[in-house]
């Protein structure tokens, strides 16, 4: 079976600080290994990466059809219009690093843009995604509680939906 790992270093808010009460999106240096391939993005939106990975525990992700797995930006977070703060839509720019995630029974298939495929046991993939997501959530918890924008209900509800979706997916 194949190999997958992901980590983030130099966690910070967009202004470069280790704490920012108003910044909702965590950034950092993302490094993923898919087999022997190292994928690295110096200033990824790490909070979005973690949520996207949690989504891939139950959903396929096709390269270049949605947000990147290691996105540059996640500057807009909105609650999904079809639910009541249960899911979030994160919009960003087209820059970042992406790969495909497919499910075949108890195997996750990670496919790079060059066609390289790694086959990961679902339990191993899930453990790695949970480890990464838990690290990111711990960073949020180590910071001052966020001050949500009082004059922007859409962003406020988007942030609430972000964590609702995160916790639902993390606990399933």
Where are these regions (language model features)?
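Short, flexible coil/linker segments at or flanking structured domains
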Residues: 20, 41, 87-89, 113, ...
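Short glycine-rich, low-complexity/disordered patches
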Residues: 62-85, 91, 138-162
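Mixed-charge, glycine-accented linear interaction segment located at domain edges/termini
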Residues: 104-172
């Amino acid at each position: 079976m194949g190999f997958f790992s992901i980590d983030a270093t130099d966690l910070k808010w967009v202004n470069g600080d280790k704490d920012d009460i108003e910044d909702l999106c965590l950034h950092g240096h993302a490094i993923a290994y898919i087999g022997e391939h190292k994928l690295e993005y110096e200033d990824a939106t790490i909070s979005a990466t973690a949520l996207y990975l949690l989504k891939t525990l139950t959903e396929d992700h096709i390269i270049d059809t949605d947000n990147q797995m290691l996105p540059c930006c996640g500057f807009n977070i909105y609650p999904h219009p079809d639910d009541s703060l249960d899911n979030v839509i994160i919009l960003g720019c087209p820059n970042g690093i992406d790969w495909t995630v497919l499910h075949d029974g108890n195997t996750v298939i990670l496919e790079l843009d060059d066609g390289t495929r790694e086959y990961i046991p679902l339990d191993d993939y899930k453990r790695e995604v949970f480890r990464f997501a838990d690290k990111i959530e711990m960073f949020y918890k180590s910071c001052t509680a966020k001050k949500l924008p009082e004059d922007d209900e859409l962003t406020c509800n988007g942030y609430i939906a972000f964590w609702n979706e995160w916790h639902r997916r993390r606990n399933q």
